[in-house]
Amino acid sequence: MDNSTGTGEGCHVDSRVDHLFPPSLYIFVIGVGLPTNCLALWAAYRQVRQHNELGVYLMNLSIADLLYICTLPLWVDYFLHHDNWIHGPGSCKLFGFIFYSNIYISIAFLCCISVDRYLAVAHPLRFARLRRVKTAVAVSSVVWATELGANSAPLFHDELFRDRYNHTFCFEKFPMERWVAWMNLYRVFVGFLFPWALMLLCYRGILRAVQSSVSTERQEKVKIKRLALSLIAIVLVCFAPYHALLLSRSAVYLGRPWDCGFEERVFSAYHSSLAFTSLNCVADPILYCLVNEGARSDVAKALHNLLRFLASNKPQEMANASLTLETPLTSKRSTTGKSSGAVWAVPPTAQGDQVPLKVLLPPAQ
């Protein structure tokens, strides 16, 4: 992220080269991400009501994505006006703060999901207390407080910068300021690389636990591996290009603060990579809702109930429609012994954490 203050000559960046791709991508994310995240939020809420700690992380992830999507219309307008912010300094600070904070909030909650799944698979009994709803709520509160606090510095600085062509940049300055460069390094290493490395370790632990389980069928192992790998892939594909350019820009500035050549060359690529991070808002609900056949069935039922409600205009039908979401993300067992989706079953044992993993599939309808 860049922050700006006042006016000045700055670097010669061509704002006309990126007025099509970022707004087009943002419009796509609004159209797809808004309904899918609303559906994911509803599904996560129902998991929380079933005392599933994973639903807490998914619910917070959906809330963060929805807040981010609410800022996109103004950024579409910003890019269509060739990087010219016309909505005043207050809105620039607020919407820029939400926009950029979401990157690290999303990464943090994806990391929380990876750690939760690792504990559920590799140590289902030893760390059972860490996988409670109360613990998930406490962890989520820490995530929000930490990430919002770490990204709050721009709220105390001017964020509008007018260049020589009378463009008013919001949350951007070319070249950046020195304190911003150091802050960017913190974001790259602490906000991006550290949680991604932790997710890699969790994935490795999940692979070991699954491979050592002789009772787990091959197809079930593939599903578990696919889920863990999908979490890593979302962070890598959506956020790695942006942070690679952010790191490069910050390092070049700290080495040669007077040199605008690099800024001018990567300007378009940097904006494109920033827009690419918005795909996270589409990938998150797809990861949750479409990770396996059982989840796809639940989504289909929810959409069927919604369409029936809209067609009949009878709210009572929607209220009576039930949706049970027990996907392979879930490690909880139903108190009734029944589930409409697939779960990771962990039978009780007195011999440590070496327990067989088994995916229980719902009976054929």
Curated annotation (Swiss-Prot):
Question: What does altering H271A do?
Answer: Decreased proton-induced G-protein coupled receptor activity
Per the UniProt record, the site (Proton sensing) maps to: H157, H167, H271
**GO molecular function terms listed in the Swiss-Prot or TrEMBL record:** G protein-coupled receptor activity
Q: Name one Pfam family in it.
A: 7tm_1
Q: Where is this region: Extracellular loop 2 (ECL2)?
A: 159-174
Q: How does it sit in the membrane?
A: Multi-pass membrane protein
Cite the effect that the entry attributes to H167A. Decreased proton-induced G-protein coupled receptor activity
Positions annotated with a glycan in the UniProt record: N3, N166
Write out the annotated subcellular location. Cell membrane
Record topology, Cytoplasmic segments: 48-51, 124-131, 213-216, 292-365
Q: What happens when the gene is disrupted?
A: Deficient mice display partial neonatal and postnatal lethality, hemorrhages, impaired association of vascular smooth muscle cells with capillaries and small arteries and veins, and impaired contact between mesangial cells and renal glomerular capillaries. The inflammatory response is reduced in an inflammatory hindlimb ischemia-reperfusion model. Deficient mice display reduced central respiratory chemoreflex, increased apnea frequency, and blunted ventilatory responses to CO2. Decreased net acid secretion by the kidney, resulting in a nongap metabolic acidosis.
- Mutagenesis / variant outcome for changing P124A: Decreased proton-induced G-protein coupled receptor activity
Activity modulation notes = Activated by a network of residues that connects an extracellular-facing cavity to Glu-147, a conserved charged residue buried in the transmembrane core of the receptor. Protonation likely drives conformational changes in extracellular loop 2 (ECL2), which stabilizes movement of transmembrane 3 (TM3) and a series of rearrangements that connect the extracellular-facing cavity to Glu-147, a residue only conserved in proton-sensing G-protein coupled receptors.
Keywords (alphabetical) are:
Cell membrane, Disulfide bond, G-protein coupled receptor, Glycoprotein, Membrane, Receptor, Transducer, Transmembrane, Transmembrane helix
Which consequence is recorded for altering E53K? Decreased proton-induced G-protein coupled receptor activity
- For this chain, the annotated S-S bridges are C11-C260, C92-C170
Q: Which domain of life is it from?
A: Eukaryota
Q: Give the Extracellular membrane side ranges.
A: 1-10, 83-87, 159-174, 253-262
Q: Tell me, what is an example of a GO biological process annotation in this record? A: glomerular mesangial cell development
Effect in UniProt of substituting H157A: Decreased proton-induced G-protein coupled receptor activity
Function, as annotated, reads: Proton-sensing G-protein coupled receptor activated by extracellular pH, which is required to monitor pH changes and generate adaptive reactions. Activated by an optimal pH of 6.8-7.2. Ligand binding causes a conformation change that triggers signaling via guanine nucleotide-binding proteins (G proteins) and modulates the activity of downstream effectors, such as adenylate cyclase. GPR4 is mainly coupled to G(s) G proteins and mediates activation of adenylate cyclase activity. May also couple with G(q) and G(12)/G(13) G proteins.
Q: Which family does it belong to?
A: Belongs to the G-protein coupled receptor 1 family.
Q: What is known of its domains?
A: A multitude of proton-sensing residues, which include extracellular histidine residues (His-157, His-167 and His-271) or triad of buried acidic residues (Asp-65, Glu-147 and Asp-284), contribute to activation of the G-protein coupled receptor activity and pH sensitivity.
**Protein name, per record:** G-protein coupled receptor 4
Give the originating organism: Mus musculus
